[in-house]
Amino acid sequence: MEELQLQGYLEKDGFRQQNFLYPLIFQEYIYTLAHDHGLNSSIFYEPMEIVGLGYDNKSSSVLVKRLITRMYQQNSLIYSMNDFNQNRFVGHNNSFYSNFYSKMVSEGFAVIVEIPFSLRLVPSSEEIPKSQNLRSIHSIFPFLEDKLSHLNYVLDILIPYPIHLEILVKILQCWIQDVPSLHFLRFFLHEFHNWNNLITPTKSISVFSKENKRLFRILYNSYVSEYEFVFVFLRKQSYYLRSTSSGAFLERTHFYVKIEHLIDVCHNHFQKILWFFKDSFMHYVRYKGKAILASRGTYLLIKKWKCYLVNFWQYNLNFWSKPYRIHINPFSNYSFYFLGYISSVLINPSAVKNQMLENFYLVDTLTQKFDTIVPVIPLIGSLSKAKFCTILGHPISKPIWAELSDSDIIDRFGRICRNLSHYHSGSSKKQSLYRIKYILRLSCARTLARKHKSTVRNLLQRLGSGLLEEFFTEEEQVISPIFQKTTLFPLHGSHRERIWYLDITRINDLANYLDWS
């Protein structure tokens, strides 16, 4: 019976990719794919212009060919880690070349690393279809509203990072059996540290989060996938396992042998001892660098889970997790930031009048309701970083967009506004979004005025007040797989209506306004 339960977990370890990925590093079309992905990945994309060199983003293939040529010429460096201080494959001391080439290599390598993961999504003709136990953002909103109001405690978790670079390479080794590709990744990670003078006693992934976003996502997601894989396994086997048994999974080497040994240990020793650790009302939700672990159990039980997580990261990934990154809080008097909202469970007292024969009496009842508030100050801070307003919330023009056509400028501002309104549609109080909408509307007007070398007042008088109607009109009707949407954010509509729109496929960059620190 235990072997059947472990079969699903062994499938991940049994996956092996024998195809060689390393030759793809020298293919120009890989960098073209990475470049095209960058064009469509964000509405904040700004065309790259290479100042002083005469290149734009359409002719950057010349630089790609130069990069490939230099990597061919110094291919031996990948197998000789001792010489990368003296001989860099970039071949230039210019800071631009260093940053530009490092970004190209990281983006291209990220495309290559995605191949083994994408192949797992292609169904085989001989494979029996299986239902995947997956939960997307579509189900998180109803979960928060339906489940959290009935739970007692929450662990507010900042997933620990940075993680050592060598551990990341070992994690990817479970998925990629192409040794040259792993050597190249190790070489590039160390070389990137040298370019930026970022060598520290604890080399970490954090330095890649801003300058090499796509590679950072691949490395970070592989790390999170690894810890969640083992964590879910131990969670479902918690009826048999001790909380400290995660030390058996210190490395994925000889995973089959450890699993077979563990089955006998679980069956013979832990079947009746550890029943007190089983928590059937535990819920785990992760969103990027944060996670919540909610439970209906007692404070002692949730404290055990905190100790369990600290030991888990320490023994399984050789990572010392600071205990203060995991907070235990009761739902009754705690508000936590998650999924772009400030969430809390409100206790609403109410009195019910009852009549029994000729006697009347009042019964006081307490009801719990999950409430979400839009955090305006972090949103304004995000707009400030994106150069739409000052830190105090005063709208300013967007000079980089002043070269676009009027319709493109209005479309970009309108798209940001619609995405934010769409994402925060489930908030119980939407009045705060009017301020965000006002900032974007006036920033759009000032950008247009900057383009036409005029003032906002003269621009509106000349083009008409209906120029920016899009910011106050109803969102267009969109066919939804769940239900048909009505007015999303009308000017005079109800601001207390709570509707979770479940057709969100990608969260706008402005929804991620808190750093992972």
Curated annotation (Swiss-Prot):
GO term, biological process aspect, one: tRNA processing
Pfam families linked to this entry: Intron_maturas2 (PF01348), MatK_N (PF01824)
InterPro entries membership: Domain_X, Maturase_MatK, Maturase_MatK_N
Keywords, alphabetical: Chloroplast, mRNA processing, Plastid, RNA-binding, tRNA processing
GO cellular component: chloroplast
Claim: tRNA processing is one of the keywords in the record: yes
One MF annotation (Gene Ontology) recorded for this entry: RNA binding
Superkingdom assignment: Eukaryota
Subcellular location, record wording: Plastid, Chloroplast
Similarity remark: Belongs to the intron maturase 2 family. MatK subfamily.
Xref: PANTHER family: MATURASE K
Function, in words: Usually encoded in the trnK tRNA gene intron. Probably assists in splicing its own and other chloroplast group II introns.
Full protein name: Maturase K
Organism from which the protein derives: Paris tetraphylla
